[in-house]
């Protein structure tokens, strides 16, 4: 919303997107409360990942969201395949489908931007696309949660850096759900 204030249609979509993303976290936390209460995040931990992002160019923000949704689609799909417990499998499968639908919506907004702005939009999308696609070479998964977003808070300005265990994501991907090169290539 911050970077697209002049686009009421996109802003309306972002409101729906935010609601659905909140739904994902609430469902996952409810699952933890029922089956792994020792892993439920505290209010302090939740508050730590809520901080302001610096303003960013609207087109790059759009592409970043698209890339994040594509990556999350695959992460959750892999988590659903990896787990054997039926409830969490279904939760991850449903979230994966939601993320794919979100990516589709972002893609439609990207196509609209290309129709309106042509080369300017293509250049902005290419810059972020190269950044997000390079994660296989860096050995670290690139997703908006581990990109620096607030100069005044650097280096503690990524969502991942504010987790109680900042190395959790890599461990989950590499050791638990085994998001390997085959899965990375799907992204």
Language-model segment annotations:
Residues 1-187:
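Non-heme di-metal
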């Amino acid at each position: 919303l911050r970077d697209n204030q002049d686009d009421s249609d996109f802003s309306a979509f972002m409101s729906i997107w935010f609601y659905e993303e909140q739904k994902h976290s609430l469902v996952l936390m409810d699952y933890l409360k029922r089956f792994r209460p020792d892993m439920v995040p505290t209010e302090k931990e939740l508050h730590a990942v809520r901080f302001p992002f610096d303003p960013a160019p609207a087109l790059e923000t759009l592409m970043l969201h698209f890339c994040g949704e594509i990556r999350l689609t695959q992460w959750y799909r892999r988590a659903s395949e990896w787990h054997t417990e039926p409830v969490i499998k279904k939760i991850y499968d449903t979230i994966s489908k939601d993320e794919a639908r979100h990516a589709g919506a972002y893609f439609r907004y990207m196509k609209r931007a290309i129709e309106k702005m042509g080369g300017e939009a293509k250049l902005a999308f290419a810059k972020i696309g190269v950044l997000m696609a390079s994660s296989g070479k860096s050995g670290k998964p690139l997703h908006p949660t581990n990109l620096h977003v607030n100069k005044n808070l650097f280096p503690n300005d990524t969502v991942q850096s504010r987790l109680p265990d900042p190395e959790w994501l890599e461990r989950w991907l590499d050791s638990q759900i085994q998001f390997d090169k085959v899965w990375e290539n799907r992204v």
